[in-house]
């Protein structure tokens, strides 16, 4: 079941790729993918290329994929291990969701962080109280790690 669904999503991604995103298997292993999200325009991540790993469980799509950044990023919802705090990757997962929708959700999280559900409270606090400092630091990290 999982493999059939993963193949279908790969075909769908090839035919209708999400804006500024790409993803596909690493080598022959269909359960292990690499994805790329380009830093959205009008965000401090603009111009950066952010790499992520996607690991599908054997119960996919009934269990969510494990998606993590491998590129360092300064963001209140992404910790230093690359873990992402996003409801659809946890409690709000639905088998109707696809990798395309997940990547678009992560991309929109880059534009609109959720400081009220942070993985990194210190960054969330800076985002809430000193947006200029947040944007400056996020841009510096993007230039240092994603370009």
UniProtKB/Swiss-Prot annotation:
Domain UBC core residues, every copy: 1-147
Key words, A-Z: ATP-binding, Nucleotide-binding, Transferase, Ubl conjugation pathway
Protein name: Ubiquitin-conjugating enzyme E2 D2B
Superkingdom of this protein's organism: Eukaryota
Species this chain originates from: Rattus norvegicus
Subunit structure of this chain's protein: Interacts with CNOT4 (via RING domain).
Originating gene: Ube2d2b
Location of the active site: 85
Pathway: Protein modification; protein ubiquitination
EC numbers on record: 2.3.2.23
A GO term for molecular function: ubiquitin conjugating enzyme activity
Claim: Nucleotide-binding is one of the keywords in the record: yes
């Amino acid at each position: 079941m999982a493999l059939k669904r993963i193949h279908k999503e790969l075909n769908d991604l090839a035919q209708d790729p999400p804006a500024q995103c790409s993803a596909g298997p690493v080598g022959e292993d269909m359960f292990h993918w690499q994805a790329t999200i380009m830093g959205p325009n009008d965000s401090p991540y603009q111009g950066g290329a952010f790499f992520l790993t996607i690991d599908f469980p054997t119960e996919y799509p009934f269990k969510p994929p494990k998606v993590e950044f491998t590129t360092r990023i300064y963001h209140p919802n992404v910790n230093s291990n690359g873990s992402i705090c996003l409801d659809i990757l946890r409690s709000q997962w639905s088998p109707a969701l696809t990798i395309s929708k997940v990547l678009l959700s992560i991309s929109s999280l880059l534009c609109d962080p959720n400081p009220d559900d942070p993985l990194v409270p210190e960054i969330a606090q800076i985002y809430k109280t000193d947006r200029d400092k947040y944007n400056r630091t996020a841009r510096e990290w993007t230039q240092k790690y994603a370009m």
